[in-house]
Amino acid sequence: GGFVHQVQWGGKSPFETVNGQMPVGFDNYLNVVFGKLNPKGQNLPDFESTNRIGNHLGSVDLGLEIDTYGATLLMYRQSLVEDGSLFYLSNLMDGLNGLKIKRKNSYGADFEINEFLLEFFYSKSQGGDKFIEGDGKARGKDDYFNHVQVRDGWSYYNRTIGIPVISPTTETSWRWP
């Protein structure tokens, strides 16, 4: 198990910034690394002075591996971390669940299956349908992999990094469900 934390920060953006520049500098870097809420960094727009600097996301990973004579079984769960809703347990249903079975013995048949992987990804909860600042029970509308300042979301050349079933907002239409 473990905790994975990634952040996009710095650079330029025309959205919610000061003169198009996103916060930079060592003080802001420390605020990014520690995910400090309401930071007191330099050159902060209103959005980040009441939030966190950068586009944070990650996962809490849990796994259990069972080693038997004939196979190794791996069961795992990755819970999504986006805006604090996991801290308040409001998006517990969202995440990736997996089961992997790997056979240890091969019998030399012309065709045999040595590994089997089954995964189920769910993201419909999003922590609920309301986001109210300061209310731990209303930390919804997670909108995974998207961000106010970084409008193309968690992407590289317009392709989402991480989970391919979630598209950045630049690739979607408001008319679609």
Predicted regions and their residues:
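Outer-membrane beta-barrel pore domains
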Residues: 45-177
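Aromatic- and glycine-enriched pocket-lining scaffold segments that form the walls
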Residues: 1-49, 53-69, 73-76
